[in-house]
Amino acid sequence: MPVFQTKRFRPSTSAGSTLGDRIGQMYRAHLSKHPFLLFGLPFLSLMVAGSFVLTPATALRYERHDRKVQQVSQQEALALGIKGPDGDGENDIKMNPRRRVLGSEKEEYYRLMAKDLDNWEQKRVQRWKGEPDGRLS
C-alpha cells in the first residue's frame, strides 16, 4: 500500500479563481495565526466608529423631541383649567369646577401638613345591582 503524503494539497491558482476567492483564502489562512488583528480589531474599530457616527443622529432625535415639548408658564397652566364655549350665548367661557388653583409650593406643603391623616375611615363604594362587590361572605 502506498503511503500518503504529509504535505497539504494546495490547489494552484487557476484562471478560474477570482481575486475575491484568493483574498478569502489568504484571510482564512492568516486568521488562525492572528485572530485579534484580523477579526477583533476591525470589529472594535467598527463599533467605535459607529458610536461616533450615531451620536449626532441621536442628538438630532432628542432636539426634535424637545422642540415638540414646550414649557408652560404658570399663567398658561391656570388658563388650561378653563372650559371652552358651551354655546349658551351668555358667557361662552366658563370656569371648570374641577380646576385646581395652583398656589405656591409652600402653601401646598403647609395645607397638606395641616390635614389629619391619622383619623380616617374606610368607606366602601356603592355597587350597581348585580355587580359583585368583592366580599367573600
Swiss-Prot record:
Principal location class: mitochondrion
An individual GO BP term: mitochondrial cytochrome c oxidase assembly
Keyword match Transferase: no
Membrane topology: Single-pass membrane protein
Transmembrane residue ranges: 35-55
Location of the transit peptide in the chain: 1-11
Primary role: Required for the assembly of the mitochondrial respiratory chain complex IV (CIV), also known as cytochrome c oxidase. May participate in merging the COX1 and COX2 assembly lines.
Protein name: Cytochrome c oxidase assembly protein COX16, mitochondrial
Native source organism of the sequence: Coccidioides immitis (strain RS)
